[in-house]
Amino acid sequence: MMMVMQPEGLGAGEGPFSGGGGGEYMEQEEDWDRDLLLDPAWEKQQRKTFTAWCNSHLRKAGTQIENIEEDFRNGLKLMLLLEVISGERLPRPDKGKMRFHKIANVNKALDFIASKGVKLVSIGAEEIVDGNLKMTLGMIWTIILRFAIQDISVEETSAKEGLLLWCQRKTAPYRNVNVQNFHTSWKDGLALCALIHRHRPDLIDYAKLRKDDPIGNLNTAFEVAEKYLDIPKMLDAEDIVNTPKPDEKAIMTYVSCFYHAFAGAEQAETAANRICKVLAVNQENEKLMEEYEKLASELLEWIRRTVPWLENRVGEPSMSAMQRKLEDFRDYRRLHKPPRVQEKCQLEINFNTLQTKLRLSHRPAFMPSEGKLVSDIANAWRGLEQVEKGYEDWLLSEIRRLQRLQHLAEKFQQKASLHEAWTRGKEEMLNQHDYESASLQEVRALLRRHEAFESDLAAHQDRVEHIAALAQELNELDYHEAASVNSRCQAICDQWDNLGTLTQKRRDALERMEKLLETIDQLQLEFARRAAPFNNWLDGAIEDLQDVWLVHSVEETQSLLTAHEQFKATLPEADRERGAILGIQGEIQKICQTYGLRPKSGNPYITLSSQDINNKWDTVRKLVPSRDQTLQEELARQQVNERLRRQFAAQANAIGPWIQGKVEEVGRLAAGLAGSLEEQMAGLRQQEQNIINYKSNIDRLEGDHQLLQESLVFDNKHTVYSMEHIRVGWEQLLTSIARTINEVENQVLTRDAKGLSQEQLNEFRASFNHFDRKRNGMMEPDDFRACLISMGYDLGEVEFARIMTMVDPNAAGVVTFQAFIDFMTRETAETDTAEQVVASFKILAGDKNYITPEELRRELPAEQAEYCIRRMAPYKGSGAPSGALDYVAFSSALYGESDL
């Protein structure tokens, strides 16, 4: 049977194996009648090539053909071939073995071919069933055209021209290769080797090929293609070389296999690149997360170690030890804390940058591990600063306490030494029985002397009480040598009590003897009575002139100077009293000379001589100018301290308002930035540089503060700004400008990633600022909802809650400007999705629902292949080999849609 069926759209001169219009396969080169009379060499080539091509597909179904004109006669393998290459199911074949069953099966195959837009010309089922070789080869060629060549498209060309253009482009760089057709251009085998080398340079050493060895070149290409590219050998090298013009259809069929093999590889490469891109983003984000965790852990560990040190309030017994503690604290403030402040600021910047990158890549927001949130670090930092302030206050309080203790201890030692010097020998004197052998006058003298002693003793009562009071105060202030103080004080008190007892006993004895004795020297008594208090006054003056003091201001020093001047004003009257006392002694001597008395040496009523009074008076006169000089030196020191206070206050009163103004200015800049982001960044960088340049003023102020600390000046009434206030304000200013610069940098990232114009950013900023009612760079949920409604969003409670989870993933209760921009641009962004990554993995897996480690290592770079293998869960579906991996769950986890 001879059917002459022309495909739709064929005009005059078009052949049976070419299509017209949209289904054009190839141009007709010869008339159909000539095509029926194939050259025997061409027929041999076609028969071998078409058989190999059919078997390359039939083997997927577990079968093959041996004789092309015989094995397709019953139509069964023909239908199976079409199902394999099309991926579609054909009607159920007839199982009978009679001729009409075979014709029916072949017709089902031909109808399926026709349903694909191909009109068969002169090919009928009867010819195929009868084993007509020419018709069978023509039918197979039609199938090859439709299913292997028609879909080839390069630029504006398709089918044969597209395949030829593809070959020309791929082989263009190679020497001795000039592909112009599908027959003679392939005879020397170099074109096939060039195609293989272009895509798999590891398989062929093209430089070693020779144009004069066509059979060797062809066999090399055939063997490599069959072994490594899964392309069966469809041609014989000898047939191609020995034929003047090899069969075009055979060559096209074989070359099309290379196109499909390499096109699939290119598609896999594209899929691998997409996966690599996604994995690179994910790995970079994980690296940032790990860096954040490491930096946060180190900062928190430093705070954990530092806080106990600052909380330690165990005082030191000596001033030098406390001074060392103060120096350690200054070193901490100057050397150890500033780098940690920078780390804290950098930690916040890294966290914001990471969250921005995660939002831009549609990854879930980063949630640090427990206890390492930015808020946790801020809380820990606030706790550190609180104990730090308390530690500094405690240090200064302890130093003042030790100063007070040192002053009291020195005063106690001085007064105790004076008292002990006064009491030295008094007990031995009171225990004497000299009155037993004395005359009346001597007894009276002893009695009067004793009265003078009692007067002196009474005068010392206040000193003893003062010594006891000093000891009590030292105990109350926890003086570290309180035990020795108590022991000495107790010895003084015991001795004083004993002196009182002995004094009373001696008086009783003298009064008993007084009844027997009548002579008394009134003048000596008068001398004793006046000299004793004057001597007391001298002792008190000497003690006061040698007294130590502790002052903290010019006013206190002036008060001491005034008291000293008042004391000097009493000296003339004291000098007159001294003259009167010395006059009494002179009168005694005159009377003795007048009446020829020979008294015992010294005054019987007092051990004090006029020489003693003169010596003490000379001591007082020497101590007065010395105390004048000491007080003037102290006044000069306090005046220097006052200048230091005023110098510090002048700088602090300028720096404090400057810092406050800059903080407010940065706040205004953050709330109302104008101009392009680059201009804003330049302005902020200039502000940052101005702030950095101002650091020298802070350093000078620190120097003045250091001088005040070294001079032990701890108060300053000339300014409300302490060094701590300046430090806190300076750290707040640095943090504020760094945070604002980071926000603009994130806006640049968002703009570049989302493709926003400056006008759009300005519009977003204007809307955001309008509803930022608190002017703190953040909108509260009600303000954010009002902003969305004003922009035309119709929001219900559920929808608004969903939007809030997007813009506020950490549930902070506010919407930042960065989150606002991200929401407004989210719908227009072109980003990767989990579905795209799944599709890419499916290409690498050859349309399987799982992928093997070998396929990952073959298609991906080694590092990222191993990353996928470690992270992918085992595939749990049926029919998978051991070690198969679930790429679907892995892709979803990359975008937060499931757990890794």
UniProtKB/Swiss-Prot annotation:
The gene is Actn3. Homodimer; antiparallel. Also forms heterodimers with ACTN2. Interacts with MYOZ1. Residues 759-794, 795-830 form the EF-hand domain. The lineage of its organism: Eukaryota, Metazoa, Chordata, Craniata, Vertebrata. Residues 44-148, 157-263 form the Calponin-homology (CH) domain. One of its GO terms (cellular component) is focal adhesion. GO terms for molecular function: actin filament binding; calcium ion binding; identical protein binding; protein-macromolecule adaptor activity; transmembrane transporter binding. Ca(2+) 1 binds at residues 772, 776, 778, 783. Residues 10-24 have a biased composition (Gly residues). Expression restricted to skeletal muscle fast (type 2) fibers (at protein level). GO terms for biological process: bone morphogenesis; focal adhesion assembly; muscle contraction; negative regulation of calcineurin-NFAT signaling cascade; negative regulation of cold-induced thermogenesis; negative regulation of glycolytic process; negative regulation of oxidative phosphorylation; negative regulation of relaxation of muscle. The modification N-acetylmethionine is found at residue 1. PROSITE patterns: ACTININ_1, ACTININ_2, CH, EF_HAND_2. Belongs to the alpha-actinin family. Residues 1-260 are annotated as: Actin-binding. This is Alpha-actinin-3. The keyword Cell inner membrane does not apply. Keywords: Acetylation, Actin-binding, Calcium, Metal-binding, Repeat. Signal peptide: none annotated. Pfam families: CH (PF00307), EFhand_Ca_insen (PF08726), Spectrin (PF00435).
